[in-house]
């Protein structure tokens, strides 16, 4: 289920600025909880900064993989928002975990690999403050506005 305010904001924003993306993130509860800040958005890609918190912990001495996956998914979505105002849902995501991190700010860089009529693909890397690779991922999104008509859904759905 989507948040009505976040849907409205996504429709309003095309080729969004970092400021507009941060305002959008404040309307999405999970994004706001992550505390990510879009620090730049340009033709090369989008950069986010995420201050580490104790709530990000998984096993002792490690950040929970779901947190890193969420940060990667958010970063990828922000890259699409910067280019075309948003995207549909994530339909595939692959994450590689390279190094554990227990504290300190995380930094992401997301770049568009392909923006198509039906799907879009974004590559994301996550680094720590020392530029060590923490995780990387690739997200595939259904293009915004491409929804099946309700009568086209299978009867069993």
What are these regions (language model features)?
Residues 1-157:
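Terminal targeting signals and extreme-terminal segments of soluble enzymes
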């Amino acid at each position: 289920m989507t948040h009505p305010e976040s849907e409205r904001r996504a429709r309003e924003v095309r080729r969004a600025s970092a400021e507009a993306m941060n305002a959008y993130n404040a309307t999405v509860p999970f994004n706001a909880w992550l505390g990510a800040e879009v620090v730049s958005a340009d033709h090369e890609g989008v950069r986010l900064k995420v201050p580490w918190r104790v709530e990000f912990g998984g096993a002792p001495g490690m950040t929970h993989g779901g947190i890193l996956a969420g940060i990667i998914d958010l970063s990828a979505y922000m890259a699409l928002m910067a280019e075309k105002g948003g995207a549909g849902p994530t339909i595939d995501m692959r994450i590689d975990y390279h190094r554990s991190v227990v504290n300190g700010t995380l930094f992401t860089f997301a770049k568009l690999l392909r923006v198509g009529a039906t799907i879009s693909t974004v590559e994301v890397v996550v680094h720590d403050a020392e530029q060590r690779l923490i995780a990387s991922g690739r997200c595939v999104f259904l293009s915004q506005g491409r929804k099946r008509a309700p009568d086209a859904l299978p009867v069993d759905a």
